[in-house]
């Protein structure tokens, strides 16, 4: 594959999960905020075309401006942000086939004016479909962090996701076992979803 860097970025890190509802978008947002707190220039790209969450997570209601050729990311908390959710109405379903999704991803990676980013954090959609393949084959990603929960069914899907990224030669930077337990008022640890 001929992978191209995203112009205006030094490092591109994808946050991925094979299943929805595991905390991937929350982790991606918190990672972006943590990197910003370290005085780094950070961008956050919500690549979940069918279920964008960045507008809600960052309370962004405005539309991005354009310089005539490229979209300008919306700046929130000092982070450059872009999402399909900024370009559509909240209640509008995205009834798109693969080629339209790929076109949207290419717009976000080639036609957004990312400026002097140390890190671009990409919040991927759940699964192993067109979006993941497009990013892995066409974008120079520095690595992926995979988010899961301890349930057996989620872990089976994670294994598939790991195999996909391995085949596409994308470095796996880490695996987060999210929602693995909580500490109750009694000080005891409870693994409500089982042990992963």
Show the residue positions of the predicted features.
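Residue-level signature of catalytic and energy-coupling elements of molecular machines
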Residues: 9, 20, 46, 54, ...
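Hydrophobic positions on the alpha1 helix immediately C-terminal to the Walker A/P-loop
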Residues: 27, 31
């Amino acid at each position: 594959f001929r992978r191209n860097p995203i112009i205006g970025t030094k490092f591109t890190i994808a946050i991925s999960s094979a299943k929805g509802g595991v905390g991937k978008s929350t982790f991606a947002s918190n990672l972006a905020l943590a990197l910003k707190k370290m005085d780094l220039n950070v961008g956050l790209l919500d690549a979940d075309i069918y279920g964008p969450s960045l507008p809600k997570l960052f309370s962004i209601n405005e539309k991005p401006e354009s310089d005539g050729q490229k979209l300008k990311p919306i700046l929130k908390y000092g982070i450059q942000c872009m999402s399909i959710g900024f370009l559509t109405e909240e209640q509008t379903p995205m009834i798109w086939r693969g080629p339209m999704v790929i076109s949207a991803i290419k717009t976000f990676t080639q036609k957004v004016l990312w400026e002097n980013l140390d890190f671009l954090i990409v919040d991927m959609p759940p699964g192993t479909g067109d979006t993941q393949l497009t990013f892995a084959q066409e974008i120079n990603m520095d690595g992926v962090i995979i988010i899961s929960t301890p349930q057996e069914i989620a872990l089976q899907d994670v294994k598939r996701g790991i195999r996909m990224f391995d085949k596409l030669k994308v470095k796996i930077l880490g695996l987060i076992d999210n929602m693995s337990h909580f500490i109750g008022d009694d000080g005891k640890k409870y693994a409500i979803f089982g042990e992963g």
